[in-house]
UniProtKB/Swiss-Prot annotation:
SUPFAM superfamilies: 4-helical cytokines. This is Interleukin-2. It is found in: Secreted. Belongs to the IL-2 family. SMART domains: IL2. GO terms for biological process: adaptive immune response. It comes from Delphinapterus leucas. Glycans are attached at residue 23. The lineage of its organism: Eukaryota, Metazoa, Chordata, Craniata, Vertebrata.
């Protein structure tokens, strides 16, 4: 009687293992990736907060969209969709200042990490909040998101 249930359980376990069910090593790798993303977002925020002239400050008033609810790694799709506009604004703003970090390299790194973390899922569609936020608010909210994800993994 229980033989069928046992076989079903074994088949399900094998299917999960074969399809890449999360393991402790993948969790550790994900934690490292989230930590790297967090550091890069902090670097961008630091760069923005080092604005020395009024033109840069005005450029940073450009508005960005935030998802209505960001609680899972798949929501990084929403960050990925706003990275190009953010990079464009920062590149224009950076041309007005001298001693700045290389925005392109930093954004490429963030894009790479986001792509790795969110996975290859392409069917997820972001639901954005109606209100927009500034670049500083945008980065702060994504930093908070990463901190939240990281804390649930520890």
């Amino acid at each position: 009687m229980y033989k069928m249930q046992l076989l079903s359980c074994i088949a399900l376990t094998l299917a999960l293992v074969a399809n890449g069910a999360p393991t402790s090593s993948s969790t550790e790798n994900t934690k490292k990736q989230v930590q790297s993303l967090l550091q890069d977002l902090h670097l961008l925020l630091k760069e923005i907060n080092n604005h020395e002239n009024l033109k840069l400050f005005r450029m940073l008033a450009f508005k960005f969209y935030m998802p209505k609810k960001a609680t899972e790694l798949k929501h990084l799709q929403c960050l990925a969709e706003e990275l190009k506009p953010l990079e464009d604004v920062l590149n224009v703003a950076q041309s007005k200042t001298q001693n700045s970090i290389d925005i392109k390299d930093l954004m490429d790194n963030i894009n790479r990490i986001v792509l790795t973390l969110k996975g290859s899922e392409t069917r997820f569609t972001c639901e954005y909040d109606d209100e927009t936020v500034t670049a500083v608010e945008f980065l702060n909210k994504w930093i908070t998101f990463c901190q939240s994800i990281y804390s649930t993994m520890t």
